[in-house]
Design a protein with these regions (language model features):
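Short, well-ordered, mixed-charge alpha-helical segments that flank or form enzyme active sites
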Residues: 112-116, 145-150, 179-180, 204-205
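Short coil/turn connectors at secondary-structure junctions
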Residues: 1, 47-48, 70-71, 100-102, ...
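Solvent-exposed alpha-helices and their adjacent loops that cap or buttress functional pockets
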Residues: 6, 44-45, 97-99, 105-106, ...
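Conserved N-terminal catalytic core of the sugar/cofactor nucleotidyltransferase
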Residues: 1-5, 13-17, 23, 28-108, ...
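Catalytic core of tubulin tyrosine ligase-like
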Residues: 152-276
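A short acidic, often aromatic-flanked loop/helix-cap motif at beta-alpha or helix-coil junctions
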Residues: 80-84, 145-147, 177-179, 264-265
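Basic phosphate/pyrophosphate-binding loop/patch that engages nucleotide-derived ligands
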Residues: 116-162
Length: 276
């Protein structure tokens, strides 16, 4: 499995601790290693091939924090164009250099996860499910309280009860407290942590079916011979800003979801940091 660490966020909700020039993924908030270094440690449990997608202004700091990775492992956005296009950029690069059928795990650089073994187990399950169903497979977090700060995924129907694998019924935006309480009490909703697994082929097929605009943007980048060239960067900067959940995931014709077997926290504010 290939791991792609998404490391382009600004983390301004933790200002002044985290700033646009020194975002939270570059800080040691929950231990001796920084958030992105901890994400790298977890990514190593998934496989030997690891990429980091980031915006140009953070590339130098990330290279300094992850000296184990070669220069070509850093996939640089010339400017932020949203999570949808940073993932498209990664898919294009991986398609040029790897097997199109190899599963890819997209993970975030600023989440707090203590159970690295459980993390790896969940992603191994997601990779297996994605291969079997030919679909993008999400990781969902069983909610421990009625959070109003996270989106929710409604599960519908069991694919593999022993492995905790489900079909996806719907997505819910961040709810008010009473709605969140209903979600948790129903037992049918998981937190959407933004983790997903699928091969280049799986993502390309789903873009063609469900997100023609995103597919067109992928084709534009893939048609340029030199990845990262001036022409490539010019084309990338001409793209609009899109979030992957809205641009593709919520439109997908078929999805599966694995219930995570690890603890998780998105440190989005000072209360989350205190709880972590």
């Amino acid at each position: 499995m290939i791991a792609v660490i998404i490391a382009g966020g600004s983390g301004t909700r933790l200002w002044p601790l985290s700033t646009s020039t020194q975002p939270k993924q570059l800080l040691a908030l929950t231990g001796e290693r920084t958030m992105v270094q901890q994400a790298y440690d977890r990514a190593r449990k998934l496989g030997d091939t690891i990429y980091v997608v980031t915006e140009a202004s953070h590339a130098g700091a990330l290279r300094a924090q992850l000296p184990e990775l070669p220069d070509e492992a850093f996939l640089i956005e010339p400017g932020r164009r949203g999570t949808a296009h940073c993932i498209v950029l990664a898919l294009d690069y991986i398609n040029r250099h790897h097997d199109q059928t190899e599963p890819i795990a997209f993970i975030h650089s600023d989440h707090n996860v203590r159970d690295a073994q459980g993390f790896a187990h969940s992603f191994d399950t997601a990779a297996r499910v994605s291969r079997e169903c030919g679909c993008i497979t999400l990781i969902g977090i069983e909610p421990t309280f009625p959070s109003t700060g996270f989106g929710y995924i409604q599960r519908d129907g069991v694919i593999d009860v022993q492995a905790g694998v489900y079909n996806v019924e719907s997505f819910k935006e961040k709810p008010d407290y009473e709605t969140a309480k209903q979600y948790v009490e129903s037992g049918n909703y998981l937190w959407n942590c933004g983790y997903f697994v699928g091969s280049v082929d799986v993502f390309r097929n789903e873009m063609q079916r469900s997100a023609p605009d995103l597919w067109s943007n992928y084709q534009t980048l893939a048609s340029i011979a030199d990845f990262g060239s001036e022409a490539y960067n010019h084309a990338y900067l001409a793209l609009d800003n899109q979030v992957i959940d809205i641009a593709l995931i919520e439109k997908a014709h078929q999805l599966a979801m694995v219930s995570a077997s690890f603890d998780w926290m998105d440190i989005g504010n000072f209360k989350d940091l205190h709880d972590a």
